[in-house]
């Protein structure tokens, strides 16, 4: 099974044809999209054979997530376990039979770090949500987690802990996920990748913000994990995970 996670930075700005062309090249079984910036009725993508799950933000042109899957979900729900309303459209959880899939778009702390308290609370809620799911069966978390936990992921930035996505608190949130038993699939497959090998278009390596994290007991199912820097249309690269 091939899964793709991609922050598309606006569904309407990418346009259907560009997205369809990218999907044809990626040829995946599951697409997890972040920052769709859609509201209901604004142009969902209809892929033959795929089930589409769309989570909208209340605020127009903001946030939003989607899952398009060939495997019909047993069920899906929005938000974290403590926030079923998810007014910002940030999280979709889908039961795909032998594992849970969680597609997430983490809050950005803002350039002045003014939203850092919100982000800390969100990180804590995400961890509790994942732990509750993982107690039942394995979990794959993917998405734009807006945090670079590895020093190698911050390319060409000297401000260190004052850079959004690289603050001590955000890195601690990522560390908590990894310490709780989740594994960074990209780093598992490519432990010795040189810094900046997959550069996020604004200066941070793609894997420095965008991830596939899997339950430790799913590691043996990982076949491959990669980024796709040649796929254009967004300021993020699509990330890929292949499992058996």
List each language-model region with its residue ranges.
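Surface-exposed cleft-lining segments at the edges of enzyme active sites
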Residues: 81-82, 106-123, 159-162
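Active-site beta-strand/loop signature of hydrolases that rely on acidic residues for catalysis
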Residues: 6-7, 23-41, 101, 130-153, ...
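Structured beta-strand-rich core segments of catalytic domains in phosphoester-bond hydrolases
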Residues: 37, 42-109
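Metal-dependent phosphoesterases centered on the DNase I-like endonuclease/exonuclease/phosphatase
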Residues: 51, 122-205, 209
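N-terminal, active-site-proximal structural segment of metallo-dependent hydrolase catalytic domains
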Residues: 1-47, 57-63
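Active-site-proximal beta-strand elements of phosphoester/diester hydrolases
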Residues: 1-9, 98-108, 142
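Conserved beta strand-loop-helix elements of the APE1-like EEP
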Residues: 60-75, 200-221
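Active-site beta-strand termini and strand-to-loop segments that position acidic
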Residues: 70, 94-97, 215-216, 234, ...
């Amino acid at each position: 099974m091939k899964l793709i996670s991609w922050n598309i930075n606006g569904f309407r700005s990418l346009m259907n044809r560009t997205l369809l062309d990218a999907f044809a090249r990626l040829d995946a079984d599951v697409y997890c999209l972040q920052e769709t910036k859609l509201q209901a009725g604004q142009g969902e993508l209809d892929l033959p054979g795929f089930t589409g799950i769309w989570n909208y933000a209340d605020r127009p042109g903001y946030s939003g997530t989607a899952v398009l899957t060939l495997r019909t979900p047993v069920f899906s729900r929005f938000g974290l376990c403590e926030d079923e309303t998810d007014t910002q459209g940030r999280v979709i959880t889908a039961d795909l039979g032998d594992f849970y899939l969680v597609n997430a778009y983490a809050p950005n702390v803002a350039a002045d770090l003014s939203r850092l308290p919100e982000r800390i609370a969100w990180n804590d809620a995400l961890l509790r949500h994942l732990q509750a799911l993982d107690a039942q069966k394995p979990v794959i978390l993917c998405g734009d987690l807006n945090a670079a936990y590895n020093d190698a992921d911050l390319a060409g930035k000297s401000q260190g802990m004052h850079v959004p996505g690289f603050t001590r608190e955000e890195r601690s949130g990522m560390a908590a996920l990894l310490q709780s038993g989740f594994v960074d699939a990209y780093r598992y497959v490519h432990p010795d990748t040189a810094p900046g090998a997959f550069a996020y278009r604004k200066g941070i390596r793609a894997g420095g913000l965008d991830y596939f994290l899997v339950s430790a007991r799913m590691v043996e199912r990982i076949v491959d994990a990669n980024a796709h820097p040649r796929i254009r249309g967004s300021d993020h690269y699509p990330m890929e995970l292949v499992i058996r």
